[in-house]
Amino acid sequence: MAKEKRPKRTPAEKARAQYTGYLVKEPMDLMGFLAAKMPDASRTKLKSLLSKRVVYVDNVITTQFDFALKPGMKVQISKDKGRKEFNNRLLKIVYEDAFIIVIEKKEGLLSVNTERQKERTAYTILNEYVQRSGKHHRVYVVHRLDRDTSGIMMFAKDEKTQHTLREYWHDIVTDRRYVAVVEGEMEKDHGTVTSWLTDRILYVSSSQYDDGGSKSITHYHTIKRANGYSLMELDLETGRKNQIRVHMQDLGHPIIGDGRYGGEGVPNPIGRLALHAFKLCFYHPVTNELMEFETPYPPNFKKLFLKQ
């Protein structure tokens, strides 16, 4: 009698099979939790898992052995124990699986080269990293952050995943938010800016009327006002080049450190563009699992609002 063939696993099933998952039921530190779940593993072995960045807490790579776990958190251990160590002062990897890499990049680092700019980028750094596991490996661009903007962004690890993310971006991404410090005290607590943006190569122009440019929509919420500044959260309905920077200029409150869009000649107390992509939430393009990534506001942003 012929053996019955097992049905092939779907990509989603294969992706989920790469991890062993545990639910946290009581408060404890990460090392204690791992020791309880893997009683035969030595402390050295457990520390090795952390240093190799194969342990995740709520989908974020965690290397801190005394990380405080709370009930309801999810701990995952990747079965890919051969992952290469990664240390780079310009970006850090916050999540990685067989299909995507989520990073936090520093200000000053280009996402991707343009024809006019031939220098080290997040794209080239990540390509060098994945090619340590195989020369045929590479990353694929999904979206970009401006050079002077810091924060969370995502790359795909294969062409099919890249296509899915680009084609269905607005369905897949549920929340994409930025924090900015702008000049002056914003008049409204919240509002929406709509304009048509045109890329003029050296700058992006904005029109309140349809002049053939790309319709662009930014929602804003004022978090705090103090010392002649406003701390803003910004939610992009569209994702055009320099969109937030241009829209803040349109409101008469340019972003601190933005010499291109309204901030020229104005003192810059933090020495950088005060714009950071702090939140990215999306449905995984293969497993359909909801992924949520968030970083704190940059400390130098918050310092501007301390009592003087």
Question: Model-flagged regions — what are they?
Answer:
Residues 135-166, 175, 194-195, 199-251, ...:
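The conserved catalytic core of RNA pseudouridine synthases
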Residues 257-269:
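Short, surface-exposed loop/helix-turn segments at secondary-structure junctions
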